[in-house]
């Protein structure tokens, strides 16, 4: 049976067999709950306390069917690789020990297992999911397309999630708190301007705008921006016109003498630029 993370770790057949043999020899140990620390690479930043309470009731009735997975991190401490919700649940029950399997994984492997395990559960918020994709891309030096293939998802799904990370922190926090939906957030991306995004975000929350209303507001803001007249450039002063004409006449005289001259003229809001190129030969 293939290891669920082998596609990301790129295990060969030999390494795969060795890992499976090792897993068969692994024993479940009961380790102190207080000696366990959360996974540093956990993509989930918020836990639903109601669901943890429900899990605690299930564990009290049926026990822990699947041990948590940890790794040793020195001084008698263990870091969770998989199973943080179970660990939190037994804490609520006041248990002193929890069944666990101890694995020898490095940081990269630990992060990958934690990220993929949570992605497979499909309980992450859109922003947590986006951060998990970004971390996997960084850890394994993958393209969006390669990550999509390994996770069995469409490339557009990965790309759309990653775009959420370009939104202001306030919008990302609203997504994290589930104050707005992913479709609300994706509508805000079109505005580009941070001030407008935040203003509309507040309006979405205060007025409880649905997605269609939000998209209509975005469209109106974009149309208003297109209609806004561009500021007029400063008119040429008399002295400036004289200066520009003098330069042009001088260039004509140089060219008439047989020297190759190229010039470019550009007008900016605050100045007029003339670039002159004279060939050395």
UniProtKB/Swiss-Prot annotation:
Residues 1-24 are annotated as: Disordered. GO terms for molecular function: DNA binding. Keywords: Cell cycle, Cell division, Cytoplasm, DNA-binding, Septation. The keyword Flavoprotein does not apply. GO terms for cellular component: chromosome; cytoplasm; nucleoid. Residues 145-164 bind DNA. Its main location: cytoplasm. It is found in: Cytoplasm, Nucleoid. GO terms for biological process: chromosome segregation; division septum assembly; positive regulation of sporulation resulting in formation of a cellular spore. SUPFAM superfamilies: KorB DNA-binding domain-like, ParB/Sulfiredoxin. InterPro entries: Chromosome_partition/occlusion, HTH_ParB/Spo0J, Nucleoid_occlusion_protein, ParB/RepB/Spo0J, ParB/Sulfiredoxin_dom, ParB/Sulfiredoxin_sf. Pfam families: HTH_ParB, ParBc. Signal peptide: none annotated. PANTHER family: CHROMOSOME-PARTITIONING PROTEIN PARB-RELATED, NUCLEOID OCCLUSION PROTEIN. Belongs to the ParB family. Effects nucleoid occlusion by binding relatively nonspecifically to DNA and preventing the assembly of the division machinery in the vicinity of the nucleoid, especially under conditions that disturb the cell cycle. It helps to coordinate cell division and chromosome segregation by preventing the formation of the Z ring through the nucleoid, which would cause chromosome breakage. NCBIfam families: nucleoid_noc, parB_part. This is Nucleoid occlusion protein. The lineage of its organism: Bacteria, Bacillati, Bacillota, Bacilli, Bacillales.
């Amino acid at each position: 049976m293939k290891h669920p993370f082998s596609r990301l770790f790129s295990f060969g057949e030999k390494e795969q067999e060795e890992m499976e043999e090792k897993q068969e020899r692994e024993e479940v140990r009961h380790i102190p709950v207080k000696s366990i620390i959360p996974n540093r690479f956990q993509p989930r930043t918020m836990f639903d306390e109601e669901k943890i309470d429900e899990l605690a009731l299930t564990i009290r009735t049926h026990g822990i069917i699947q041990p948590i997975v940890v790794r040793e991190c020195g001084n008698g401490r263990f870091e969770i690789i998989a199973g943080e919700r179970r660990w939190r649940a037994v804490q609520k029950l006041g248990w002193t020990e929890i069944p666990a399997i101890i694995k020898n994984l490095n940081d990269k492997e630990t992060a990958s297992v934690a990220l993929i395990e949570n992605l497979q559960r499909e309980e992450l918020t859109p922003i947590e999911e986006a951060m998990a994709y970004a971390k996997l891309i960084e850890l394994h030096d993958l393209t969006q397309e390669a990550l999509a293939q390994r996770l069995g998802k469409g490339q557009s799904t990965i790309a759309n999630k990653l775009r959420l990370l370009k939104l202001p922190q306030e919008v990302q926090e609203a997504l994290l708190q589930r104050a707005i939906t992913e479709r609300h957030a994706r509508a805000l991306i079109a505005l580009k301007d941070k001030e407008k995004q935040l203003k509309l975000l507040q309006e979405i929350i205060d007025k409880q705008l649905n997605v269609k209303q939000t998209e209509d507001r975005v469209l109106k803001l974009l149309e208003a921006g297109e209609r806004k007249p561009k500021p007029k450039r400063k008119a040429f002063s008399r002295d400036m016109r004289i200066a520009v004409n003098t330069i042009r006449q001088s260039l004509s005289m140089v060219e008439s003498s047989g020297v190759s001259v190229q010039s470019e003229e550009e007008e900016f809001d605050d100045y007029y630029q003339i670039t002159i190129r004279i060939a050395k030969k």
